């Protein structure tokens, strides 16, 4: 009989308060998510002070609900896992403090988790991981290609030099009058439009795996503002389609090139922007055409955004590998995987 390991996991890196109970890193017994989107929408983005206050209000409620839904108590737990970075320092501290308090009070090991590792392991709920593997992480704060030679080993081979893809979505969303977060609406609009504006594909042909989206963002904003000054009304669906096509072309091109150079057994697609239907469809197509022997695991739609279930999955791996933190664990807002020299 397989030994049962229960992990209580905390995620509070940005604007979602989430607590989950995970069995053996692969079974979700509960995954409570308290979102703050309504509070941040009128500001057009996340306000750190507001986010921290909401985390304080929600963290105890979420913890109690997670335990109740999983039908377990503290005595059943084997470990407490928590995101300690990257993210907003004030938000991270709420989760870290709660996790430390519970670990201390119930004499449980405290397992630190990198938020980005959590996003990768969200795909673990879809199927078994095979190594070596490549992960394309696309979110509001990060856009990275991560090579994993083995479990618990992460090497960045490419990343954005400026804006993350999700950040660019939100910024152009403001120009289009779309509420934060803008990604879902722009994805829906893009499906109704055509790539008529031919926005730049920055760094697409450069001999590396890095990304850049600030030039695309500027080109988009200038196009809309110039049209406004001429009194010209541009089609919002075509604008969305043109923007999204530029983003997807670069993400897909760089990912295929990375897979050409790094023989892997699997590709993982994860992060908030991994919920984008256009991106999923393009990668499905390109993998079948260019790398038919490499299976792709896409994080489930409901686990693409920030949640504690993904932290529990990554936390279980860390727990198995002996990762432990003391009660002096602190938030590390700029936490990163190691960067390696590209092949």
UniProtKB/Swiss-Prot annotation:
Keywords: Acyltransferase, Cytoplasm, Iron, Metal-binding, Transferase, tRNA processing. It comes from the Bacteria. It is found in: Cytoplasm. GO terms for molecular function: iron ion binding; N(6)-L-threonylcarbamoyladenine synthase activity. This is tRNA N6-adenosine threonylcarbamoyltransferase. Fe cation binds at residues 115, 119, 306. Its cofactor is Fe(2+). InterPro entries: ATPase_NBD, Gcp-like_dom, KAE1/TsaD, Peptidase_M22_CS, TsaD. Its main location: cytoplasm.
